[in-house]
């Protein structure tokens, strides 16, 4: 955002003292990489990104989705397309018997973690988030997947709600809806010989945005 008139030929990237420019937020297209979920990309129709890699990675995580499918395509400059898969986001979590199979409302997962992907230097990654209506993408994270242990049965989940509920002087309930945070407290077991490796991983990500996933299935 420009902070004063006559702002011509001033590069925001070199304005370290915010004399001409104020960093307000990422533009709509790049909100998927701003490190937060509160302000998603919003667009009618598909949201697509094409990213080039100079390092090795093997995992893509997408959060805050309002979409129907996610397509992940990886292209090698010599071999061509080496991975192309579409991941449906429709969820069966609400279906647990014959009645809910017939009458439960369709729901879609808002998060997706894709592992075992062949990223390496020179490859190109294309991510397409598809919806027939309005599409939202909260955040996209790309990195290396590290196994740190097996989750245990007493892992707990929670919800931190920042909404306000209070009564006014006449007793009427006033509700102000705000954002919320989903929380999880993972308990997991790991081999003793893995302790130092896990500690090194935690040290590297201690001041960075990171994804912790319980995985799919009871053994993850």
Where are these regions (language model features)?
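Hydrophobic residues in beta-strands and at strand termini
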Residues: 2, 51-53
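Intrinsically disordered, low-complexity regions enriched in Ser/Pro/Gly/Gln/His and often acidic
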Residues: 13-14, 52, 92
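Extracellular/virion structural assembly segments
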Residues: 25-45, 55-220
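Short strand-edge motifs at loop-to-beta-strand transitions and within beta-strands
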Residues: 47-49
């Amino acid at each position: 955002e420009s902070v004063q008139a006559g702002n011509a030929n001033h590069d925001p990237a070199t304005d370290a003292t915010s004399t001409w420019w104020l960093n307000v937020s990422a533009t709509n297209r790049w909100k998927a990489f701003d490190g937060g979920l509160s302000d998603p990309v919003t667009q009618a129709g598909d949201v697509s990104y094409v990213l080039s890699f100079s390092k090795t990675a093997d995992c893509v995580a997408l959060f805050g989705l309002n979409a129907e499918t996610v397509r992940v395509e990886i292209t090698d400059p010599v071999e061509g397309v080496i991975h192309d898969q579409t991941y449906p986001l429709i969820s069966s979590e609400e279906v647990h018997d014959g009645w809910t199979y017939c009458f439960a409302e369709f729901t879609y997962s808002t998060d997706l973690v894709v592992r075992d992907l062949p990223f390496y230097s020179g490859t190109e990654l294309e991510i397409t988030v598809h919806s027939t209506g309005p599409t939202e993408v909260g955040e996209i994270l790309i990195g290396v997947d590290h196994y740190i242990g097996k989750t245990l049965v007493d892992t707990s989940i929670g919800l931190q709600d920042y909404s306000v509920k209070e009564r006014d002087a006449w007793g009427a309930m006033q509700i102000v809806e705000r954002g919320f945070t989903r929380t999880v407290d993972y308990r997991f077991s790991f081999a003793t010989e893995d302790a130092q490796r896990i500690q090194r991983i935690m040290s590297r990500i201690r001041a960075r945005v990171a994804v912790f996933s319980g995985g799919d299935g009871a053994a993850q």
